[in-house]
């Protein structure tokens, strides 16, 4: 990872074989998520209630799904990478399904994502986990190799894991706590699989 704090986060979440890069973020030459460490939480700050929080989490999962789908297509000639990102697309779809069902059970209606996005000037386009616009991320990976694309995916998943852990601890609603705890556990699984594949490709 690019920093000791990120490495500490992953170790605290139960991941093994975590390393910190010499030089930290200043030595990193790849793409980075926008904003400060609390930036992910900021997406949810204007949300008036739990229903909006669930809807916004869905929007971030949708953005990640679109990104993984694009990367999978980019590496269609690499069976392992194509399969991995295809699996991540399915995983994000499952997250969306769970969040959508939760939203509908709470409100009795489908979420209006256009209305939700209008509350956030930074979400006037598809944004994925980590706060990165999907179009920007897909443009970045076009001329990158497998390892760089995997590293970006890992950075995204670290952001998502951090965000969902914070949400599960900061929300009082027990249903919300359960949802975000479950999501954080699944993001940890994503991280483990991506890290294992990156080790294999290096």
Task: Indicate residue ranges for each PLM-predicted region.
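Non-heme di-metal
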Residues: 1-202
């Amino acid at each position: 990872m690019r920093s000791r704090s990120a490495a500490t986060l992953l170790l605290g979440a139960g991941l093994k074989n975590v390393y910190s890069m010499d030089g930290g973020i200043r030595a990193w030459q790849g793409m980075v998520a926008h904003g400060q460490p609390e930036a992910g939480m900021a997406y949810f700050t204007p949300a008036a209630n739990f229903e909006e929080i669930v809807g916004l989490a869905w929007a971030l999962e949708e953005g990640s799904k679109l990104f993984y789908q694009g990367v999978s297509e980019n590496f269609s000639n690499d069976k392992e990478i194509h399969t991995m990102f295809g699996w991540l697309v399915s995983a994000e779809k499952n997250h969306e399904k769970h969040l959508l069902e939760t939203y509908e059970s709470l409100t009795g209606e489908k979420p209006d994502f256009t209305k939700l996005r209008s509350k956030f000037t930074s979400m006037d386009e598809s944004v994925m986990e980590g706060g990165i616009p999907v179009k920007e991320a897909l443009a970045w990976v076009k001329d990158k190799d497998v390892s760089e694309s995997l590293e970006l995916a890992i950075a995204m998943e670290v952001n998502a894991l951090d965000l969902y852990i914070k949400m599960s601890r900061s929300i009082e609603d027990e249903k919300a706590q359960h949802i975000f705890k479950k999501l954080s556990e699944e993001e940890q699984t994503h991280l483990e699989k991506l890290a294992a594949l990156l080790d294999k490709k290096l």
